[in-house]
Amino acid sequence: TFRDIFERGGEKNWKKILDLVRTDCRDVETMMEKVYLPEYEGGLFNGGAAQMERPNTFIIQQGRAAESVLMEIVKKILAARHPGKVFTIPSNGHFDTTEGNIKQMGSIPRNLYHKELLYQVPEGGKYEKNPFKGNMDIEKLEQLITAVGPENVPLVFTCITNNPICGQPVSMGNIREINRVAHKYNIPLIFDVARWAENCYFIKMNEEGYADKSIAEIATEMFSYCDGFCMSAKKDGHANMGGMVAFRDKGLFWQNFSDFNEDGTVKTDVGVLLKVKQISCYGNDSYGGMSGRDIMALAVGMYESCDFNYMHERVSQCEYLAQGFYKAGVKGVVLPAGGHAVYINMDEFFDGKRGHETFAGEGFSLELIR
């Protein structure tokens, strides 16, 4: 399923081997030939012997656990190579657990978003095109890397959509530029993609050159720019649980975090370290702590998120509610709405009369349900 959506370039190329499982195919030769034995390599999802020899895809039961597995192994490798060294990891907006995991590494998370963009609202509250307020500030990224030194930036993260910035989308052009800058300095680019399908929808609807492309086609291009990703699959996977860590086979992340002998052979494969952590903490790599039912629900849900009509209805509901608040005079409504929620700036709502120590947002929520 992940190969279909993130690597095969659209619905016309999908294999949908899920249907064999869903229809309870009992033909052993068919299942072995199409499901269990095919070998895939070179992308984000190795299969067959390649996944056994160079594991690069790891099912985990939820996103923050997947993130924790990744960051614990990264921490272990960096600590062994550079004891006591403090690293900096930039993002367009670290999710709170990402920021927490980075701090637990002893590293510094940096958020490089456009603060000045977030609360700008045009006359009447309507944008002709989404301004992609979730974009990373590319100039700040270049400045940060050169200021601290590229050797002190082990990873660049990109949160898609930008969860801390009110679920605002990230443009394909911005993703391409983040990739360019990161690779210029030999730094792997890691996506946090809990809401990948929403982001693809926003790109389709608002970015030049993508109107005629499907969500799945856009997803394939988007994922081509990353060296790895962490995912909570409970959002755009339509499932009760699920997550994943994956990195590109023999790509920049693998090169930077594996150890090699003098003759170039692999001494320690970072994928093996991740697999050991996955199995020891969450479950065998065939299920990662998830039930068969949840794995099937996730596989079905991933395809469902590629349905334009579904995604259009979902995102439109958020915009409808946000516009309703704005027209009713509610202060601080963030416009345009993201794809999963409506956000209100509590500083503006309370006219700056509430300090952060008063937990204005929590108080506001309590008043709504009192």
What positions do the PLM features span?
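A structural motif shared across PLP-dependent enzymes of the aminotransferase-like
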Residues: 1-27
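Helix N-cap / beta->alpha transition motif
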Residues: 1-2, 137, 345
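Short, intrinsically disordered, charge-balanced linker/junction segments flanking boundaries
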Residues: 8, 36-42, 368-370
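Conserved PLP-enzyme active-site core in the AAT-like
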Residues: 19-330, 359-362
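Conserved PLP-binding catalytic core of the aspartate aminotransferase-like
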Residues: 332-370
